[in-house]
Amino acid sequence: DFVKFYNEHIGTSCDGEGVGLKFEDEYGALTLCNGIVKTEDGTISCTIDIRVPVTLKAAEVRAMCADRLEDENGRIEVGEIGDPLFFPKESPLVNALYKAYVDVTGDTENEPMVIGGGTYAKSLKNIIAFGPEKLGMDYHIHSADEFILVSEMEEAVLVYMEAIRNLLAI
């Protein structure tokens, strides 16, 4: 039945192992999470959301799991998978943004980081998703009671202003 199929392939794991997608590179691990489960004409189906590590492409991910997403007990549909958005640390864009961060905050300890989240920046060319996050602070991102301190928001505005100046100079 579908529940057995789902539990064998997805279950409570978010690492993609059940569909042959367990993969990690130096920037992070692939994540695979349940999307929408629905019943239509007596058939249960679900979608999955996959966030792809930097060194994989969407087509490779589809090929890796194609034969493991359907059997007599169910079918899992893969929604749109976007190729990762990535710029190396040496990129002029990354350098301009990081310099703005350091100049405003004085923080030279924390470096630019790569995350696996989705972003509208993927819709444009030569764009980087960029935002404030203090390491060690739990902002409850995408959860109940998500927040940012007013002082950190004010600092972020100054970083964004400096970042715009730096980007205009490229």
What is each model feature region?
Residues 42-58:
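C-terminal catalytic subdomain
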